Each structure stands twice: as structure tokens, then as C-alpha cells.
Regions:
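Membrane-lumen/periplasm interface segments of multi-pass, membrane-embedded glycan/lipid transferases
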Residues: 3-18, 322-418
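Transmembrane-helix motifs of polytopic, lipid-linked glycan transferases
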Residues: 32-36, 181-208
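Membrane-interface helix-loop-helix junctions at transmembrane boundaries of multi-pass membrane enzymes
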Residues: 40-43, 294-303, 411-436
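Transmembrane-helix signature of polytopic, membrane-embedded enzymes
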Residues: 43-47, 177-180, 199-219
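Interfacial juxtamembrane loops and adjacent helix segments
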Residues: 86-185
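Membrane-interface alpha helices of multi-pass inner-membrane proteins
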Residues: 223, 260-277, 282-288
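Short acidic/glycine- and proline-prone juxtamembrane loop motifs at membrane-interface regions
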Residues: 227-234
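Perimembrane helix-loop-helix junctions
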Residues: 244-257, 280-314, 328, 334-335
Length: 522
């Protein structure tokens, strides 16, 4: 490492030495500050959460280059299209391409690939030249005027998922920031939303506060939080939904369900369900709430609430994702592939379909079994962040750290607090069932939408898809009886604070490793 940075002295890459030193200082300050806050009892956990997750996410956001996260370019395009609408400008050209500033064409048609005929996305391939390009471009001054287009097409989803990033892009355009400044400001707004909703989750949930904190410190979660990915929005909203339901279910019997609670759940249904349909399954957790909490004559009120929330879920999904619904229930199982054959014909791929699954009722279970046998270890690794970027094997979290992340998270999930409400056996069974059902729906949806009929395991499933409902499974094993283990105290820091501090330290080591990997790639 020392030899590498010595080679930068006196060259155009000398700025990387300062960046690396600044990165180390920032990480040390963040970790030291959070450990000090843990020792001060007057600081609430949700306040420490916001500071820790926002600051760590900010460092991840600035270190991992723009548009390097999984599918980030598609979500950036969606946010840019919404920004066009906010500014009252044409969203697309006559050919259906999203309009962007000429300045921002640099991001989607990066000249650093030295191929004028190839539209390479900045951050698609990570090497030293990406940092050099960002340094040369700067943050604050756009150098080009006029408009251009991007060939990238946005993801079809609710505009709510891109509202904050689009606000960041709009502000950057009004301030005439450079392309790099624009893309970072949009990322910043998405991170701000994630940290805010996460802090609200930790404050609201009656159990598992440290668990939500720990999952938010996974390298994968921090990378997504500081990117344009709508997974950041989904994870944050899912966490808050789980916290709201647990609060309503486990609060004291005298705390009934009010109109405000129903409105809150209805708003969450509108915000979350159309973004990624499968996560609407989380609303089944509402059945944890005792019917008696609806007050006198509860059943009519309960039924009305269920019908209202259910109608909002179904209606919002059909309004936003009608074509996707048809795609998942596709009877023919034939889809157009994006490439052409050598003869110029459009290639078609036969996918698994519902008729096939209905005819052979054990097929889906055999395929899921094969998938878990082949990719189960990868799911566990990529949930934490085994590979960052676009599954870049060089931007990796080492195996010992993956084990420690999982071990720390499991301990924080299982070891409860004496004063917190306990989950009953029916509660635990239902939470376990909802987790299995959501996992099953996830697998089946990817089987029907992406998996060729001649493939015996499911394609397209990634570990990050499990993050929004991972707390449901882990909280089902909560054991307040083990609260004595929290009495373990090291250097004046509590058990949970010690584990969270270790996770932050591992995040720092992972990020430093990623930076060194990228700068070594000439």
C-alpha cells in the first residue's frame, strides 16, 4: 500500500493520497463519536442511529463512485425523469428517451472508456480512472449547456420512490452544479430519507431496536442507502411498517387503535405496495394486532380497516404495476429477450409459467430446494454485502467479517431486554409464517419472470431482497429471558453498543479495502 501511494507523488493521482487520509480520519471520527454517544445515557438510541447510519452512509456514498450500486443507473434515470416533471420541462424526446442536461451526458456516456460508439455508465467498471474523472470534473460548476438524452430506461414504479433523489437532482440543476455534484446530491437526499425513516423505526418499535440498527449497518444496506436504488426506500419503509405494527400489537391493552393509526397504515400501504409488489405481504403482520384494540364493538371497525387497507394495496398495485402483474401471471411463459440472433430475428426464451406449476404441484418446491442448495450461501453473503458495487468480486467483505456481522446481528436479535413486551407463541408462529410466505412469493415471482424453463434453479434472486423482511424472522426468536447477558460491560460500553461499534469498525475496514482495490486498478 505504501509503495502504491509513493508512486502517486508528483503525478496527477497525488490527490488520492489526500482522499485516503481524509477517509481514514472521517471513519475514525465517526466511530469514536458514536462510541462516546453510546456512553452518554442522555442520548437516545434513535438519535445515535441517525448520526451513525447517516455519517457512515455518507462516507460510503462518497467513496463508492456514483452509479456503481446494483441497477443504480436505472433508478437515477427514473429520478431524473421525475425531476424534469418537477421543473416543468419535457420528460422525454420524440423517441421516448429521457431528457438530461448536456452536462450530465458525462455520467451515462462516460468518455473515459475511450470508445465514442459505446455508452458506458460512469461507475459501471470501477478503476482509478473513475476517481480521476470525478476529481477533474469537480462538484460545483457545470461546464456545458444545452440538453441531451440517455438511452437508459427507468424502472416502472411509483414516483414516490424517487421523490427525494429527484428533489436533489432538481436543486443541483437550479444551482448549476456539475454532473458529479448533481449525482451526489441526489444520493445525499436518498440517504437522508433512509436515515430519517430508520431513526423513526428505532424510536417506534417496542422490541428489537438494536436489531434494526445492526441490519442498517450491513455494508450492503449502507451502499444501497447512499445510492439511487429504490431498495433504500423499500427497506426503510418496510422497517418502519414492521415497527408500527409491533407497536400497535404489543402496546398496553389500554392503548387502542385510533383513526390516526388506520390512516398511518393506509399511507404506508400506498407508499410501499406499488414500489415492489411482493413486500405488500408484510401487511399480513397486522393480524398480530388484537381485534379488541378497536374498542367497543370492534369487529365492524376491524373489518372496515382491513377492507380499506386491502383496497389501497390492491388498487395502488394495479394502478402502477398492471403490466407487471400480467407478466407474473403470464400463461404462455414466452418472453422477448433483449438481444437478436445472428440472422436478425428477435430471440425468445421459454420461461416457467403458472400453468406448469399448477400441473406439477411439487415442481416449485423442488426448484426452490435446488436454489437454496446452490445459492443459499451466496444469499447469506450478499445480504450482508459479500460483493459490493455491481457484484464486483474485488469490492468484497471478507468471510470472517460476514460471519461476525451475522453473529452480532443474531445476538442482538435474540437477547431481549427485561422491560420490553414479550412475544407470545402465536405471535412468533405468525411472524415465522409471514417470513416464509414472503420468501416463497419472492422465489416464485423470480421463477415466473426471469427463469428459463430449462433451468433447474431460480435466477435473479439477490441477498438484498431479503433485507426488508429479515427482522420479521429474527425477532421471532427474541428471548427477553436472556436479558442478563446484557449486563456484560466492557470499558464502560454496554453489550449492544459494543457489538454495534464492532460492526461500524468492520464497515470502515470494508470501505478502506474497497478504496484501495479501486485505486490499484490502473
Amino acid at each position: 500500500m505504501l509503495h502504491l501511494f509513493q508512486s502517486f507523488i508528483g503525478t496527477g493521482d497525488q490527490f488520492l493520497i489526500g482522499r485516503f487520509a481524509l477517509l481514514i480520519i472521517a471513519l475514525c471520527v465517526i466511530i469514536a463519536t458514536c462510541l462516546c454517544l453510546f456512553k452518554k445515557s442522555r442520548w437516545k438510541l434513535h438519535q445515535i442511529y441517525f448520526i451513525a447510519v447517516f455519517s457512515m452512509g455518507l462516507v460510503f456514498m462518497c467513496t463508492l463512485p456514483p452509479l456503481s450500486a446494483p441497477d443504480e443507473i436505472l433508478h437515477f434515470t427514473g429520478a431524473y425523469a421525475l425531476s424534469n416533471q418537477m421543473m416543468g420541462q419535457p420528460v422525454r424526446d420524440e423517441d421516448g428517451h429521457v431528457r438530461i442536461r448536456q452536462e450530465d451526458e458525462y455520467l451515462v456516456n462516460w468518455p473515459g472508456d475511450n470508445d465514442p460508439c459505446k455508452a458506458t455508465v460512469l461507475g459501471q467498471a470501477l478503476d482509478r480512472s473513475v476517481y480521476e474523472a470525478m476529481h477533474e470534473k469537480g462538484l460545483f460548476h457545470a461546464t456545458e449547456t444545452g440538453t441531451s438524452i440517455t438511452l437508459q430506461q427507468p424502472v416502472k414504479t411509483t414516483p414516490c420512490a424517487y421523490l427525494l433523489p429527484a428533489l436533489g437532482i432538481t436543486l443541483a440543476r437550479l444551482l448549476k452544479l456539475s454532473a458529479v455534484g448533481l449525482v451526489l446530491l441526489g444520493r445525499f437526499m436518498n440517504l437522508l430519507l433512509f436515515a430519517t425513516l430508520g431513526a423513526m423505526t428505532v424510536r417506534r418499535t417496542p422490541i428489537g431496536k438494536e436489531l434494526f440498527f445492526a441490519i442498517s449497518l450491513f455494508p450492503m444496506t449502507l451502499e444501497l442507502a447512499g445510492s439511487y436504488s429504490y431498495d433504500s426506500y423499500i427497506i426503510a419503509l418496510s422497517f418502519y411498517l414492521i415497527a408500527v405494527i409491533l407497536d400497535l400489537a404489543l402496546a398496553k391493552p389500554c392503548a387502542g387503535i385510533t383513526r390516526k393509526n388506520v390512516i398511518e397504515l393506509s399511507a404506508l400501504a400506498l407508499l410501499l405496495s406499488p414500489c415492489k409488489m411482493i413486500y405488500a405481504t408484510l401487511f399480513l403482520l397486522c393480524l398480530l394486532i388484537p381485534v379488541q384494540k378497536w374498542g367497543a364493538r370492534p369487529w365492524p371497525k376491524w373489518i372496515l380497516s382491513v377492507l380499506l387497507i386491502g383496497a389501497l394495496i390492491v388498487g395502488s398495485i394495479l394502478l402502477v404495476n398492471f403490466r407487471e402483474v400480467i407478466r407474473y401471471v403470464n400463461a404462455s411463459g414466452v418472453t422477448q429477450a433483449p438481444e437478436f440472433t445472428s440472422s436478425g430475428d428477435v430471440n425468445t426464451v421459454k420461461l416457467h409459467d403458472l400453468a406448469e406449476l399448477i400441473h406439477d404441484r411439487t415442481l416449485v418446491f423442488r426448484i426452490i430446494r435446488n436454489t437454496l442448495q446452490i445459492l443459499g450461501g451466496q444469499f447469506l453473503g450478499t445480504t450482508v454485502g459479500m460483493w459490493l458495487g455491481a457484484f464486483d468480486r474485488g469490492l468484497a467483505t471478507p468471510m470472517p467479517m460476514l460471519v461476525l456481522f451475522w453473529a452480532g446481528t443474531l445476538l442482538l436479535a435474540i437477547i431481549g431486554r427485561r422491560e420490553e413486551p414479550a412475544l407470545s407463541i402465536p405471535h412468533r408462529v405468525w411472524m415465522f409464517f409471514v417470513f416464509l410466505l414472503l420468501g416463497f412469493i419472492l422465489m416464485v415471482s423470480m421463477l415466473l419472470a426471469y427463469t428459463p424453463a430449462d433451468t433447474f434453479y431460480i435466477l435473479g434472486v439477490q441477498g438484498r431482497y431479503f433485507l426488508p423482511f429479515l427482522p420479521v424472522l429474527l425477532l421471532a426468536f427474541r428471548a427477553p429471558q436472556l436479558h442478563r447477558l446484557r449486563a456484560i460491560d466492557r470499558v464502560g460500553i454496554g453489550f449492544d453498543a459494543l457489538l454495534l461499534g464492532v460492526m461500524m469498525l468492520m464497515d470502515a475496514l470494508v470501505l478502506l479495502g474497497c478504496f484501495l482495490t479501486v485505486v490499484q486498478r490502473a
